[in-house]
């Protein structure tokens, strides 16, 4: 799924680079799924082409609500994406209804491995009498009666009963995604914490984050100043040296690069100071404020935890202000790994746009930039090792504790 998404965005960027996005985007679904090609899990090639068409929407910063007439060509949407002054979408993620397979909401099914045994453990243990029997003695489930308790699944000695999940719903920790009356999944923004699990779980790649790639690229094409503030976890994203990765950002057209790890140093110091103050006031503990997905979880599902969340800004918050001070007339673009940061960027006036590492990889491919061949770019003020440690599990806790020293 990631490969498909990467390729599609790279193809769009390639058209943009050659000033052919509006002119040739309508041919893209046909080129990706020629008449004699084998559909990728779809029933026929025309369905596959329709899926390609609608998957371009979120990659251009649009969603399904932007389509008011199905006969409107993609070129019109491409023109809209390139001409808008600012991103105007309130939602962070969207479901491509044409790509959603409307997974059947049946959690348990008895397979033909059923031996029609005498013990009939499934029948004897079912609390709702939902087990029926065929003429050949094999069991079957009456889904109108079944409550999906799973007791039959556990009791079958032959493991002939299988659990069939709806992958996106199964992966969501807060039950923010569910089907509408047409069987298509929808994300409830009032519940969603933007963890991105549903996007990774969907086997059909029907869930997308709404990209700002072309907003960023258009500013670059206009010759405007853009500063990339890059999360330290980029060290594990590409195979070349970090200096070559930074050089690639210069090749794309960024004016300067600032490590978010610089902001992490300030977060560590300020959060340690805040922790000591809270403990002195009698508060028993304090939780981090660095993860926007966690912040959403607290605000929407664990409101009793609000008093314990740190008020210290995240590394991105401080890095953006460092960038603004150094380049007051530039647009600030946060570059990071996760969906949830899109929500934090919306809240932070100092950050203008966001790109994920995946989008950066597609931009590099689309612009034919080879990481191994670019000139290295070194940052004058590199951050200390501890600041880069924020990217590892438990890094925030470890280095905040170290900053507080033996006072806690």
Task: Set out the residue ranges of the language-model regions.
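Ferredoxin-type iron-sulfur electron-transfer modules and their immediate structural context
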Residues: 1-155, 159, 165-169
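Iron-sulfur-cluster electron-transfer modules
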Residues: 144, 158-321
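Hydrophobic/aromatic beta-strand patches that form the interior of the parallel beta-sheet core
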Residues: 258, 333-335, 353-355
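A short secondary-structure junction signal
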Residues: 299-300, 343-348, 365-366
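Short beta-strand/loop segments at the ligand-binding rim of alpha/beta enzyme cores
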Residues: 328-332
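Phosphate/adenylate-binding glycine loop and adjacent helical scaffold
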Residues: 338
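A conserved active-site cap/scaffold subdomain adjacent to cofactor or substrate pockets
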Residues: 353-357, 367-370, 380-398
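Single conserved hydrophobic/aromatic residue that forms the stacking wall/gate
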Residues: 399-408
